[in-house]
Amino acid sequence: MTTIQQQRSSLLKGWPQFCEWVTSTNNRIYVGWFGVLMIPCLLTAAACFIVAFIAAPPVDIDGIREPVAGSFLYGNNIISGAVVPSSNAIGLHFYPIWEAATVDEWLYNGGPYQLVIFHFLIGISAYMGRQWELSYRLGMRPWICVAYSAPVSAAFAVFLVYPFGQGSFSDGMPLGISGTFNFMFVFQAEHNILMHPFHMAGVAGMFGGSLFSAMHGSLVTSSLIRETTETESQNYGYKFGQEEETYNIVAAHGYFGRLIFQYASFNNSRSLHFFLAVFPVVCVWLTSMGICTMAFNLNGFNFNQSVVDANGKIVPTWGDVLNRANLGMEVMHERNAHNFPLDLAAAESTTVALSAPAIG
């Protein structure tokens, strides 16, 4: 018994030092307990992504024995290349490498895609937890990780929730530039996302957030308190950790209040920066919620054939033009996987005139 206890104590001898190192805020880069999970997951995802982007063989994404190539070695470039989603034949099944009969089968069915996205999602979730952990150690408020939850929610929406709703990981977003655009086009064709209010909020958040960031940065830069001569860089007028303000918020407030109107300008630096954080974050949250609802086919608004004249005849509108564009994109994607999309097979088509008749 004494021998066993001595062996256990020798094995755990370095444990307190390891715990101290992991949770120390004096390290150049904070590790943290979430970092212990984050680091191997993100490294695994990055390594598999790079190898698959360079050398993965074609993947039977639609499950119809028509493999789609996405790697450099099979003719793609940085724009057209992607890690192709796992096969529709796999569906929502968890498909680790040991579930396949051979490595060739695993590659053919798109196994690397699942490996990358699962490790990536765990890694970014752990990164968010690590942000909270470091804030806690330093006695800071926890809002950094709350803000980061917006892009995390977006990643979970397109890589996990949407495939769950559609019934197959083959419907997830490909890991590449043109693959992302293809995902966007197909999403518009099948769900009319551009007409979804939550997506509109996300667009407002991205463009509005960029506008507010540019406005804030330019106002601050334009109202710096002079500390240098004309021949020196104005950046030398600031010393890291100085107590006094480096710009005149009263001047910035006065300028913007006169440029627009008084109450359009913040007179409180804290409320200003809270707004700069909360506006894009809430809008991206809404977009993620929109993706999650459309995953289960609660789609954007459509105004197809919504205007009729006194005789009941349909008056074509831009809503019908948009619907025609959606149908065009829908018939072009996965063109060999089905003969007719459900939208086209369900009812009689309605002619929409897009050109004026000849006169004379």
Swiss-Prot record:
Single annotated GO MF: oxidoreductase activity, acting on diphenols and related substances as donors, oxygen as acceptor
Q: From the UniProt record, list the reaction(s) this protein catalyses.
A: 2 a plastoquinone + 4 hnu + 2 H2O = 2 a plastoquinol + O2
Residues the entry annotates as binding a quinone: H216, S265, F266
Task: List all membrane-crossing ranges.
Answer: 30-47, 119-134, 143-157, 198-219, 275-289
Q: Which InterPro entries match?
A: D1/D2, Photo_II_D1/D2_sf, Photo_RC_L/M, Photo_RC_L/M_CS, PSII_D1
Q: Could you tell me the membrane topology recorded for this protein?
A: Multi-pass membrane protein
- Which Pfam family, an example, fits this chain? Photo_RC
Q: Which residues bind chlorophyll a PD1?
A: H199
Q: Which GO terms describe its cellular component?
A: photosystem II; plasma membrane-derived thylakoid membrane
Q: Where is this site: Stabilizes free radical intermediate?
A: H191
Per the UniProt record, the site (Tyrosine radical intermediate) maps to: Y162
Q: Describe how it is modified after translation.
A: Tyr-162 forms a radical intermediate that is referred to as redox-active TyrZ, YZ or Y-Z. C-terminally processed by CtpA; processing is essential to allow assembly of the oxygen-evolving complex and thus photosynthetic growth.
EC category: oxidoreductase
| The enzyme's E.C. designation | 1.10.3.9
Task: Reply yes or no: does the keyword Oxidoreductase apply.
Answer: yes
* Residues noted as binding [CaMn4O5] cluster in the record, renumbered to the chain: D171, E190, H333, E334, D343, A345
| Similarity comment text for this entry | Belongs to the reaction center PufL/M/PsbA/D family.
The name on file for this protein is Photosystem II protein D1
